[in-house]
Amino acid sequence: TAGLPPVLKNYSEFQKFMRTLQKANAIQSIREVWWDIRPHPGFGTVEVRVCDAVPTIEEMVNLAALIQCLTVGLSDHYDDGSQLEILDPWIIQENKWRATRYGIDADIIINDTGALQSLRGTIVDIIEKLLPIAEKLQCKNELNNLINMVENDDIPYKRQMAEYANSKDYIDIIKLYINELKK
């Protein structure tokens, strides 16, 4: 992807940003913007690129449920007039790098004083806070599946690494994913 989107205060700023890119001939349409997450005005949706890397249908459904619950939760905050704490862009970028480098075992920065928290714990905490929303959306099982994956270290990239450590053959990783997708 092209990484994280710029910090924009509201949808009007997003629209202005897109118009500027188009007028400057940087893009022809929103489809040429490949951020990790972006709104798609034509569909009225939010696109999240991480789903492209999920190897099984079940895991993709679990992740889609999480994204749906996050969207509803954030929308509820907006409707209530609540302000979310927003980290500085450099902290968000650093946390993305840490997650990319260290995976689920990363420690992420949670404030501007440099306090750290485990990514694993943060994920579980967020999912647990979303369980009431998941109950309403009838996707609580999917969120519980994600908690189990995180707590049991059953993460796709770790399965890849374990397969390679066992066989020393990249073809076996492809076979693993083909077999998982068939389930």
PLM regions and their residue ranges:
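C-terminal accessory/tail domains of diverse enzymes
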Residues: 1-183
